[in-house]
C-alpha cells in the first residue's frame, strides 16, 4: 500500500500538520504573494489576478444544480406533513411513511456511485446533462404522478418516483460538483475555495431555505383546505432552476484539465485500479468517515427543532409551524457564507475542524443544560442557531471541497461519489439508529434523557470528526488540484502505467499541464500542429 498520507511516527502524527500551515493559511499574504506561490506546471499559463465573469459562470452553472438537493429533499418533509393531514391513519400506519423517506436515500447513493463512474469513464459533461434531465423529469413526476385510483397505488407511485428523483439528485454530486471544482480552479489564488462553496454547499442550504419559504407562501394562497394543490405545486417549482441551468449548461465544455488527463480511452483491463486504490485508500477513508459522521449526527441535531417548536407554539396552526421552519433553516445561511471565506483564509481542513469541534462543544453544553434551556426559549433558540451555523461553517460547506481537492482529475468523480455516498449512508443510518436510542432511553422519571443521550453521542462524534480532520486529513492549499494532478501522473508513470493514454491527444498535449484555463483555441492549434508533424 502507498503510504504518503499515513503518519510515519507518533511525532509526525502529533506535529506533522504544522509544516503545512503556511500553505493553508493565507490571511497574512497579499495578492501578489499568492500569485507568486501559485503552482502552475505550465510556465506559459498566465496566472489570473482578478475574478472575471466568464470564469465564474461555468462554476456557477455546474454547481448550482445542488440547489435541487436542498430544495427537493426538504420539500419531501412538507409533502409528508401534508399527507399525514390529508390521509391520517391510512398514511401514518402504512409502509409508505417510511418507504418514501428511506427510498430517497437509496436512490441518492445509487446516483452518486453510478454517476461517479460515468463522470470519469464515459462523459463528465454528458453525465451532468443526463442528471439534469432526470432531475427535471422526476421532480415533475413526483409532483403530478399517480398510479391507479387507490390511495395505496398513489403511495406506491410516489415511492417509485422518489427513488428515481434520489438517483437524479445523487448524480449531481459527482458530476456538477466535480466540474465546479475544476472551473473554480481557474480563478485567482486566494478566492477559489469561497466560490466553490458558494456555488455548491451554499446552494444546498439556499435550497433548504427556499423550500421552507415556498410552502409557507403557498399556504397563504391555497389555505389549509387545498393541501393537495399546495404540496404538488411546492415540489413542482423545484424543476424551475434545473430547467434554466439545462440551457446554460448546453454551452459548457469539459474543463481543460479533464480533457488533458481523463482516462476515457483506457480499456477496462488496462485501467490502473490497484494503483489508484493504493494511492488514495487512506485519504478517501478519512474524508468518507468525516462525511459519514457529519450526516449521521445531523439527524439527532434536528430533534431539538421539535423541542423549541413545542415550547413556543405547542398547539400552533400549520402556518406558524412552517414559519418557524423558515427561521430554523435561515440559521444555515450565515454559516455557509462565512465558512466559504474561512476556507480561503484558513484552508478547508482547519475550517472544518474548527467548525465541527465548536459544534460538538456547544452540543455537550446544550444537552447538559437541556432542562434549563427548555424554560428559556429565546436563549435556547439563539444557542441552537449558533450551533446550526457552526455545522455549516465547518463540514456543511467544506467536506465537499475537501473531497474535490484531495483527488486527481482522472478519478475525481469516482472519489467524490464514494465519499458523498458514505455521507448519505450515514444520514440513512442515523434515521434508524437515533429513534431506537430514544426509545431505549425513554423515561417517565427523566423525560430529557431520551434526547440527551443521542445528542451526547452526536456531539462526541463531532469532536472525534474534528480530531480526524485535524490530524489525519490531508492539507489543502490554493493550488491543491494542480499539485495533486501532477503527483498522480508522476505516480502512475513511476509504476509502469502508460501515461500517453491520458487525455484526448497525448501526442500534442503535455500531461503535466493540468491548470484549467480558457485557452481552448491554443490547445486546438497545438493539436493541429502535432497532427501535421505526425
Swiss-Prot record:
GO terms for biological process: organic anion transport. The keyword Transport applies. Induction: In contrast to the other glycerophosphodiester transporters, expression is largely unresponsive to phosphate levels. It is found in: Cell membrane. GO terms for molecular function: transmembrane transporter activity. GO terms for cellular component: membrane; plasma membrane. The keyword Lipid biosynthesis does not apply. Keywords: Cell membrane, Membrane, Transmembrane, Transmembrane helix, Transport, Virulence. Gene3D superfamilies: MFS general substrate transporter like domains. Disruption phenotype: Triple deletion of GIT2, GIT3 and GIT4 impairs the uptake of glycerophosphocholine (GroPCho) and reduces virulence in a mouse model of blood stream infection. The chain crosses the membrane at residues 63-83, 96-116, 135-155, 163-183, 202-222, 230-250, 289-309, 322-342, 350-370, 377-397, 417-437, 453-473. It is a multi-pass membrane protein. PROSITE patterns: MFS. Probable glycerophosphodiester transporter. Does not possess detectable glycerophosphoinositol (GroPIns) transport activity. Might be involved in the uptake of glycerophosphocholine (GroPCho). The expanded ability to utilize GroPIns and GroPCho results from the organism's pathogenic nature and its need to occupy a variety of environments within its host organism. This possibility is buttressed by the fact that GroPIns and GroPCho are present and abundant in human fluids. Belongs to the major facilitator superfamily. Sugar transporter (TC 2.A.1.1) family. This is Glycerophosphodiester transporter GIT2. It comes from Candida albicans (strain SC5314 / ATCC MYA-2876) (Yeast).
Amino acid at each position: 500500500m502507498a503510504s504518503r498520507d499515513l503518519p510515519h511516527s507518533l511525532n509526525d502524527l502529533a506535529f506533522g500538520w504544522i509544516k503545512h500551515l503556511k500553505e493553508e493559511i493565507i490571511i497574512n499574504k497579499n495578492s501578489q504573494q499568492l500569485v507568486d506561490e501559485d503552482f502552475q506546471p505550465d510556465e506559459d499559463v498566465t496566472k489570473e489576478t482578478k475574478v472575471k465573469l466568464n470564469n465564474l459562470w461555468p462554476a456557477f452553472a455546474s454547481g448550482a444544480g445542488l440547489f435541487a438537493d436542498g430544495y427537493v429533499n426538504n420539500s419531501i418533509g412538507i409533502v409528508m406533513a401534508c399527507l399525514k393531514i390529508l390521509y391520517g391513519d391510512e398514511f401514518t400506519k402504512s409502509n409508505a411513511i417510511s418507504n418514501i423517506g428511506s427510498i430517497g436515500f437509496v436512490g441518492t447513493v445509487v446516483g452518486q456511485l453510478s454517476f461517479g463512474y460515468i463522470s470519469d469513464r464515459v462523459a463528465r459533461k454528458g453525465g451532468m446533462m443526463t442528471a439534469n434531465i432526470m432531475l427535471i423529469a422526476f421532480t415533475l413526476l413526483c409532483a403530478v404522478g399517480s398510479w391507479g385510483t387507490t390511495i395505496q397505488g398513489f403511495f406506491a407511485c410516489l415511492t417509485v418516483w422518489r427513488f428515481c428523483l434520489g438517483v437524479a439528485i445523487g448524480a449531481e454530486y459527482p458530476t456538477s460538483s466535480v466540474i465546479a471544482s475544476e472551473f473554480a480552479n481557474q480563478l485567482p489564488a486566494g478566492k477559489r475555495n469561497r466560490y466553490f462553496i458558494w456555488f455548491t454547499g451554499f446552494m444546498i442550504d439556499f435550497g433548504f431555505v427556499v423550500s421552507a419559504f415556498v410552502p409557507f407562501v403557498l399556504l397563504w394562497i391555497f389555505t389549509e383546505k387545498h393541501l393537495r394543490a399546495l404540496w404538488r405545486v411546492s415540489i413542482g417549482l423545484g424543476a424551475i432552476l434545473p430547467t434554466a441551468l439545462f440551457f446554460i449548461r448546453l454551452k459548457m465544455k469539459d474543463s481543460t484539465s479533464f480533457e488533458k488527463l481523463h482516462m476515457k480511452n483506457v480499456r477496462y483491463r488496462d485501467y490502473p485500479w490497484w494503483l489508484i486504490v493504493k494511492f488514495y485508500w487512506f485519504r478517501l477513508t478519512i474524508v468518507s468517515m468525516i462525511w459519514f459522521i457529519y450526516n449521521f449526527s445531523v439527524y439527532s441535531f434536528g430533534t431539538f427543532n421539535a423541542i423549541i417548536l413545542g415550547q413556543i407554539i405547542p398547539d400552533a396552526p400549520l402556518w406558524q409551524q412552517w414559519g418557524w421552519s423558515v427561521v430554523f433553516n435561515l440559521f444555515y445561511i450565515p454559516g455557509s457564507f462565512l465558512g466559504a471565506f474561512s476556507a480561503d483564509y484558513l484552508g478547508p481542513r482547519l475550517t472544518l475542524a474548527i467548525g465541527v469541534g465548536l459544534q460538538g462543544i456547544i452540543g455537550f453544553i446544550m444537552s447538559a443544560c437541556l432542562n434549563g434551556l427548555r424554560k428559556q426559549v429565546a436563549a435556547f433558540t439563539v444557542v441552537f442557531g449558533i450551533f446550526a451555523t457552526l455545522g455549516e461553517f465547518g463540514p456543511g460547506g467544506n467536506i465537499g471541497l475537501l473531497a474535490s481537492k484531495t483527488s486527481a482529475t482522472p478519478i475525481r468523480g469516482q472519489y467524490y461519489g464514494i465519499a458523498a455516498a458514505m455521507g448519505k449512508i450515514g444520514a440513512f443510518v442515523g434515521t434508524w439508529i437515533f429513534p431506537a436510542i430514544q426509545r431505549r432511553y425513554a423515561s417517565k422519571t427523566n423525560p430529557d434523557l431520551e434526547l440527551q443521550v443521542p445528542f451526547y453521542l452526536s456531539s462526541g462524534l463531532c469532536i472525534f470528526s474534528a480530531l480526524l480532520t485535524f490530524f489525519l486529513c490531508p492539507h489543502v492549499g490554493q493550488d491543491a488540484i494542480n499539485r495533486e494532478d501532477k503527483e498522480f501522473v508522476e505516480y502512475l508513470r513511476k509504476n509502469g502505467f502508460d501515461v500517453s493514454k491520458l487525455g484526448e491527444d497525448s501526442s500534442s498535449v503535455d500531461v503535466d499541464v493540468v491548470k484549467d484555463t480558457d485557452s481552448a483555441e491554443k490547445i486546438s492549434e497545438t493539436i493541429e500542429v502535432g497532427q501535421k508533424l505526425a
